[in-house]
Amino acid sequence: MGSSAITVSFLLFLAFQLPGQTGANPVYGSVSNADLMDFKNLLDRLEDKMPLEDEAVPSQVLSEQNEEAGAPLSPLSEMPPWMGEVNPAQREGGVLGRGPWESSDRSALLKSKLRALLTAPRSLRRSSCFGGRMDRIGAQSGLGCNSFRYRR
């Protein structure tokens, strides 16, 4: 009882004597104000050099470019190809008369892949204690977590 009281009082004494070391140390405490001002000036200069998106290409210039190119672009042609549903060749049935991802083909492919995953032999057993090599060593020596599986 006496030694634990001395230990606790000593720890409390250290906690009150060393407040800077027991508190949180913020990252910005190690950066000087001069460095922060230099960084702020650098950011301001970069912002001045980089034009805003609205200022970079005025809307009048865009409309003039569209008129020069012919008919104005439709909203669908502005979308990237990966955003669309399917491309026109797939929508019309492709070259061979049917799309490459017809629903029955796709479901059959997914079923076969799932079946292959479920029936595939497990090359590595699950072990919560050791890796594969340690399991083999443990099995031969009687040590390890999975040694009960290898009894002969």
Curated annotation (Swiss-Prot):
Residues 58-101 are annotated as: Disordered. The precursor molecule is proteolytically cleaved by CORIN at Arg-122 to produce the atrial natriuretic peptide. Undergoes further proteolytic cleavage by unknown proteases to give rise to long-acting natriuretic peptide, vessel dilator and kaliuretic peptide. Additional processing gives rise to the auriculin and atriopeptin peptides. In the kidneys, alternative processing by an unknown protease results in the peptide urodilatin. InterPro entries: Natr_peptide, Natr_peptide_CS, Natriuretic_peptide, Natriuretic_peptide_atrial. The keyword Acetylation does not apply. Residues 146-150 are annotated as: Important for degradation of atrial natriuretic peptide by IDE. Residues 1-24 form the signal peptide. The modification Phosphoserine is found at S128. Belongs to the natriuretic peptide family. This is Natriuretic peptides A. The lineage of its organism: Eukaryota, Metazoa, Chordata, Craniata, Vertebrata.
